[in-house]
């Protein structure tokens, strides 16, 4: 992440803690529940796979593999390591529309972050290219002497000015007031208007997914969800899983902690799990140049499963074949290693699962998608 002094901050949606207070107005819908469908961006540039890994690792303050760290420091490969692709090729460009003031922007609803900031007209013109821009000078009220700043695990970050403005998501409008102490999130403030203090994620493989707020749509999952308690002491949707499976190999006694993060692409798992999974794939190897596990693109990948009590959350092998490295016949895996707990379960895991985020507990429920 570059460090820009001209971005603009607003509310967080779905984490537990934030520095932003979002107060519901009288225009907030009172139906008790609503659904948001993701939108497909029609023209995108897809990132070189190691860059996406870099994003996930730095977001969760994880050590960077030497190759990824070296690339991030020197820029070079990240600057020219992108290719033009069809929109759904890597399942990374599904977003949600939000209106701030009079401007409609694309955002990623993210359970793994406590910050939400947007590109604004205060950025240099070059940095505004290929982005929808918020124009605070038209509808916002600038807070004097108020700034925001966020940093990531690799020492980079972003910063900017603070404005008040109206934020509208799926017809629900809130007025945002920023204060320099922890406050409720946007979701925390609308919970009292919902039938139940829950939201669910039903993300899809190569198709737009859905977020439901205030209810559980039983037509979207199979069987009864299996629940785990959440440890929210660090502001994350974090829990302990009781095992995993790689193909026919069952490891029902290997317990590990993980954050369920809708804003991260990969499954970032303990090294022992990662190595066991790729050991069954002919031609797979840890590619030091690209900083992650790779394999021949024509390889047939085995299923992977995470144990949630007695339920096995199965991830099809095709969901783990994340992307082809440009100019090669080698593909980058959707499972990558981390050496520090907790692990992170991102899009590669979520695209096959129906996940319930329940503030009453708190707890999370898991079931197979219908």
UniProtKB/Swiss-Prot annotation:
Coiled coil: none
UniProt cross-references to CDD domains, sorted A to Z: Aspergillopepsin_like
Subcellular location(s) of the protein: Secreted
Catalytic residues in the record: 110, 261
Single GO biological process annotation from the record: proteolysis
GO CC aspect terms: extracellular region
PROSITE patterns: ASP_PROTEASE (PS00141), PEPTIDASE_A1 (PS51767)
Enzyme class: hydrolase
SUPFAM superfamilies tied to this protein: Acid proteases
GO molecular function: aspartic-type endopeptidase activity
Stretch forming the signal peptide: 1-21
EC numbers: 3.4.23.-
Glycosylation sites: 80, 102, 251, 298
Domain Peptidase A1 as annotated: residue spans: 94-367
Keywords associated with the record: Aspartyl protease, Glycoprotein, Hydrolase, Protease, Secreted, Signal, Virulence
Free-text function comment from the UniProt entry: Probable aspartic-type endopeptidase which contributes to virulence.
Assigned protein family: Belongs to the peptidase A1 family.
Protein known as: Probable aspartic-type endopeptidase ARB_04018
